[in-house]
């Protein structure tokens, strides 16, 4: 059985070391990625004071939210959003969508938000590793698309950027993708959230300025 307290304490220790090396004033938030976890495991981490959880699929988000509705949890949608799932996602009112990966998707979401009279907080996903397997806008177009969404999608509240580190064992390449995203983030007025870093690379992400981490296997793997 997982020792939940031991796991989260080990994570926080690593985060604190990386955070204070970057800046004593830097604040880092953890989103526990619970896509393969049971509601019981989430409950255990809630008992350890973890509040934000993320899911990859809308249906899984719905299931977990309903089974844990008695807890004051903050839910994030971190996986790619299919257009036919927009209504379902909006009905769940997540705290944040991390994976807004195109202007086209933004316009589709905006249209549904307007009809339903709701807003959605989101991050623009940047494919800073230039990998075909990853979603997101290319860095060269990111600022222009961010601006377009901000101006044309009044119900979509952009809060910053998200990226997934390069899929490689070469730490320099991973760092490069994080630095690329951080440089873009620094050019966006009023951007507050930089979602970078997962279980294998969160310390490097913090060193590059991440303030929101998406941690799955570190917390939930046996």
From Swiss-Prot:
This is Pyridoxal phosphate homeostasis protein. It comes from Helicobacter pylori (strain ATCC 700392 / 26695) (Campylobacter pylori). Keywords: Pyridoxal phosphate. GO terms for cellular component: cytoplasm. Belongs to the pyridoxal phosphate-binding protein YggS/PROSC family. Pyridoxal 5'-phosphate (PLP)-binding protein, which is involved in PLP homeostasis. The modification N6-(pyridoxal phosphate)lysine is found at residue 35. InterPro entries: Ala_racemase_N, PLP-binding_barrel, PyrdxlP_homeostasis. One of its GO terms (molecular function) is pyridoxal phosphate binding.
């Amino acid at each position: 059985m997982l020792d939940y307290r031991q796991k989260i304490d080990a994570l926080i220790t690593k985060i604190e070391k990386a955070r204070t090396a970057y800046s004593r004033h830097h604040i880092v938030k953890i989103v526990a990625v619970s896509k393969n976890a049971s509601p019981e495991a989430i409950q255990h981490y809630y008992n350890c004071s973890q509040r934000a959880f993320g899911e990859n699929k809308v249906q899984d988000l719905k299931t977990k939210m309903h089974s844990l509705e008695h807890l004051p949890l903050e839910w994030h949608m971190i996986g790619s959003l299919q257009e036919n799932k927009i209504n379902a996602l909006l009905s769940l009112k997540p705290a944040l969508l991390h994976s807004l990966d195109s202007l086209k998707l933004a316009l589709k979401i905006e249209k549904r938000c307007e009809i339903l009279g709701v807003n959605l907080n989101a991050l623009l996903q940047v494919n800073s590793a230039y990998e075909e397997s990853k979603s997101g806008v290319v860095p060269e177009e990111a600022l222009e698309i961010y601006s377009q969404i901000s101006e044309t999608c009044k119900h979509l509240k952009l809060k910053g950027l998200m990226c997934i580190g390069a899929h490689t064992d070469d730490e320099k390449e991973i760092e490069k993708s994080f630095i690329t995203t951080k440089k873009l983030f620094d050019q966006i007025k009023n951007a507050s959230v930089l979602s970078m870093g997962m279980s294998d690379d969160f310390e490097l992400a913090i060193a590059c300025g991440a303030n929101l981490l998406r941690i799955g296997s570190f917390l939930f793997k046996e």
